[in-house]
């Protein structure tokens, strides 16, 4: 039933979009590219409510010197990708999503903690819901035009595997992995398909980074080694995603030359840095700068975390997210090849 409902919605949206685009103007040269972002804390630049941890110290201490809603000490993936593409930083859905006038920048729909499925704990809109926000802006409210604005714009779907954490804890048997991974990737593919109907110039989707190397996992080894028990699931996800993206590119009816969908290989970039093979060498790459319950206080107002002396010396900021320097290193590795793939 779940699959049929999604299929019905996909077909309805597909025909709705193609009926609407005829009234739009032809695509213009991409002189001022817009960037549209969907995902979670790796891409969020301030969509969470002011009560979220991302709005509390020590988040933001490197940039802008105070909490900005980013899950880092400073800039995150969205900031670095926008710079590489020559695009202005996207507006936030939280502050601009209800405006009724045409906007001259893209928009960031990413929320910290967002998953493929609805979280029973976090109220963040899931990824397909975020894509639905843009569909509403483009079709119902005409804030963005499809053949005009979106056809000359770039999109990023950032997925950091939040759905997998609880699943792994409850299912230590690997036999359950393939079916769950297929379900996750199917949902990501569904969202990418809707984005394809919106005619973005190019669409980037992140590979799954090494979950077993995140501080929330490596704390068990005092941040000395990754937990390889996560490797098979990550490998299954990335192999399945690669097939899904290849299928989308093959079946793309709107693109006559080149591939619209590009995989941002976060896994390779993370591993290069964690294995100390990149240009930037972090002394203890598995250890976070903000160690413990970052940004939280106990009942007496004492910090429940400790902070490193220099965030630039750390790859990870907290138990999940990289530091600004970490993201800089990642996008330095992704660099020119990613930019060329997205702008061709």
From Swiss-Prot:
Q: Which GO terms describe its biological process?
A: lipid catabolic process
Record localization: Secreted
Please report the organism this UniProt entry assigns to the protein: Arabidopsis thaliana (Mouse-ear cress)
The organism that produces this protein has a lineage beginning with: Eukaryota, Viridiplantae, Streptophyta, Embryophyta, Tracheophyta
Instruction: List, alphabetically, the Pfam families matched.
Output: Lipase_GDSL
* PANTHER family linked: GDSL ESTERASE_LIPASE (PTHR46020:SF32), OSJNBB0059K02.9 PROTEIN (PTHR46020)
- Note the Gene3D superfamilies from the entry: SGNH hydrolase (3.40.50.1110)
Name this protein carries in UniProt: GDSL esterase/lipase At5g03590
One Gene Ontology cellular component term attached to this UniProt record is:
extracellular region
Q: What class of enzyme is it?
A: hydrolase
Quote one Gene Ontology molecular function term.
Answer: hydrolase activity, acting on ester bonds
**Glycosylated residue positions:** 126, 227, 238
Regarding protein family, the annotation reads:
Belongs to the 'GDSL' lipolytic enzyme family.
- Which EC number(s) does the record attach to this protein? 3.1.1.-
Q: Which domain of life is it from?
A: Eukaryota
Q: Which UniProt keywords apply?
A: Glycoprotein, Hydrolase, Lipid degradation, Lipid metabolism, Secreted, Signal
Q: Where is the active site?
A: 41, 318
Task: Using the record, list the residue span of the signal peptide; answer none if the entry has no such feature.
Answer: 1-19
Main localization is secreted
């Amino acid at each position: 039933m779940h699959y049929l409902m999604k299929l019905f919605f996909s077909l309805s949206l597909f025909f709705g979009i193609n009926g609407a685009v005829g009234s739009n103007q032809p695509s213009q040269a991409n002189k001022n590219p817009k960037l549209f972002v969907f995902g979670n804390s790796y891409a969020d630049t301030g969509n969470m409510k002011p009560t979220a941890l991302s709005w509390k110290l020590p988040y933001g201490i490197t940039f802008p010197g105070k909490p900005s809603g980013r899950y880092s000490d400073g800039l995150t993936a969205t900031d670095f990708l926008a710079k590489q593409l020559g695009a202005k930083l996207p507006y936030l859905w939280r502050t601009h999503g209800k405006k009724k006038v045409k906007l001259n920048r893209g928009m960031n729909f990413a929320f910290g903690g967002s998953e493929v499925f609805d979280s029973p704990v976090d109220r963040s809109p899931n990824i397909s819901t975020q894509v639905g926000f843009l569909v509403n802006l483009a079709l119902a409210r005409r804030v963005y035009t499809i053949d005009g604005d979106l056809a000359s714009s770039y999109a990023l779907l950032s997925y950091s595997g939040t759905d997998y954490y609880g699943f792994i804890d409850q299912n230590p048997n690997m036999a359950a992995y393939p079916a769950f991974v297929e379900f996750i990737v199917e949902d990501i593919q569904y969202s990418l398909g809707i984005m394809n109907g919106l005619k973005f110039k190019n669409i980037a989707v992140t590979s799954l980074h090494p979950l077993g190397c995140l501080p929330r996992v490596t704390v068990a080894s005092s941040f000395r080694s990754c937990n390889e028990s996560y490797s098979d699931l990550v490998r299954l996800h990335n192999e399945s995603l690669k097939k899904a993206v290849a299928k989308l590119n093959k079946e793309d009816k709107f693109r006559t030359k080149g591939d619209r969908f590009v995989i941002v290989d976060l896994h390779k970039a993370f591993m290069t840095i964690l294995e100390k093979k990149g240009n930037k060498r972090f002394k203890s790459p598995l250890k976070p700068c903000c160690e413990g319950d970052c940004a939280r206080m106990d009942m007496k107002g004492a910090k429940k975390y400790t902070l490193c002396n220099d965030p630039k010396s750390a790859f990870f900021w907290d138990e999940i997210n990289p530091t600004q320097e970490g993201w800089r290193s990642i996008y330095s590795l992704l660099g020119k090849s990613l930019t060329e793939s997205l702008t061709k």
